[in-house]
Amino acid sequence: MRNAILIALLRLPLALMLFILVAPAKAGSFTETDKSVRLIVSGIVSYTRWPALSGQPKLCIYASSHYRQALSSEDEHNPLPYSPVIVHSDRDALTARCDALYFGSESPAKQQEIINQYQDQALLLMSEQNPECVIGSAFCLIIEHNQVRFSVNLDALARSGVRVNPDVLMLARNKKHE
C-alpha cells in the first residue's frame, strides 16, 4: 500500500510536466486560417443581439466543419463569446436548443432544410461551404489561399430574428478584413 502511494506521488510531477509541455502545444497548434475563422466567428457573434437571450449564446457547430476544433477550444487568453456545442446531426442541433448554427460541409440546400425546422426562433446562421451565400446561412465564410473573409445574405439575416451591428455588415463589403 505504501509503495503504491509512493509510486503515485512520483508519477504526479511527471504527469504535471507532461501537461505543461503538451497544453501550450495544443493551444498553439492552430494555423493562421484557424485563428482567422475563430476571430471572425467570435466577432460576428459578439456584435449580434437576440431578442430574448440572457448570457452567452449557444453556438452549435456541425461536426463536418473543418474548423470545429478552433471554434470550440477554450483559450484563457481569448475567451469565446459563445458556448460551443459540437453537433453530429440535425436532431442533435434541435435538441441542443441552439442560438446560432455554424455549418460545415452541409450544402446550401441542406442548410435551408435545417433552418426551416427552427420556426419562429431567433437564430444566427453561419457557414464555411456556401460561397455564393444566396440561400441558407446569413454569414458565409470565404476561405481562399489561407485568407478568410465573409459575405452576408441580407435576406437570410432579415428572416433570422437576430440583430447585427451595421459595422459588421460594412466589413462584409470590405474585402480586406481577413
Model region roles, listed by residue range:
Residues R2-A8, A25-E178:
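Short hydrophobic alpha-helices and adjacent helix-cap/hinge residues
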Residues R11-L21:
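Bacterial N-terminal signal peptides
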